[in-house]
């Protein structure tokens, strides 16, 4: 795969990519050091978990998340698409991701090029590409102004949808909208 940054991401690097919603500051969700680096680069509150992009529903198993038929129906109703779904994950080894909330938010994007990248890299954390408290970058140039050489690569440009994902919570088998 020739997409810029795939090898960098596979080896624990951090970059900026256009996701299905906004530009994201991305890195491997399965690499604790990478996730910590993203928190530092972004200046993000350590208590706020990150959204994880996945390439298929089966990727949830990587995080120890099993789901029943009812949950599967909910997932298939909203995915693929710009909806992040909060699910229970009390696994201690993923504390660096859930930050004590014992839940994780996942999104399976509809953007085919992004899903192709995810198939090669594995799940990625992808908070918006901006320092905490500032507006999300709307161009690669803006992201470069924010992060300069603190990241390992910048992906190809493009026009973001300019709206963050909807977030729903299904931890109690009910669909609750957290952010629309």
Q: What is each stretch, according to the model?
A:
Residues 1-180:
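Active-site-adjacent structural elements in enzyme catalytic cores
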């Amino acid at each position: 795969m020739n997409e810029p940054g795939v090898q960098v991401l596979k080896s624990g690097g951090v970059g900026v990519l256009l996701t299905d919603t906004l530009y994201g500051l991305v890195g491997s969700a399965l690499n604790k050091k990478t996730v910590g680096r993203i928190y530092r680069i972004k200046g993000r509150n350590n208590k706020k978990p990150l959204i994880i992009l996945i390439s298929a529903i089966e990727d949830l198993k990587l995080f120890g998340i099993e789901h029943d038929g009812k949950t599967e129906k909910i997932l298939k109703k909203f995915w693929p698409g710009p909806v992040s779904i909060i699910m229970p994950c009390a696994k201690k080894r993923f504390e660096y991701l859930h930050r004590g909330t014992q839940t994780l938010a996942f999104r399976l994007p509809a953007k085919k090029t992004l899903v192709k990248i995810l198939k090669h890299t594995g799940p990625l954390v992808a908070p918006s590409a901006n320092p905490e408290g500032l507006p999300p970058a709307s161009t690669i140039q803006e992201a470069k102004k924010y992060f300069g050489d603190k990241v390992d690569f910048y992906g190809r440009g493009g026009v973001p949808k300019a709206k963050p994902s909807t977030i729903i919570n299904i931890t109690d088998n009910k669909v609750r909208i957290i952010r629309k």
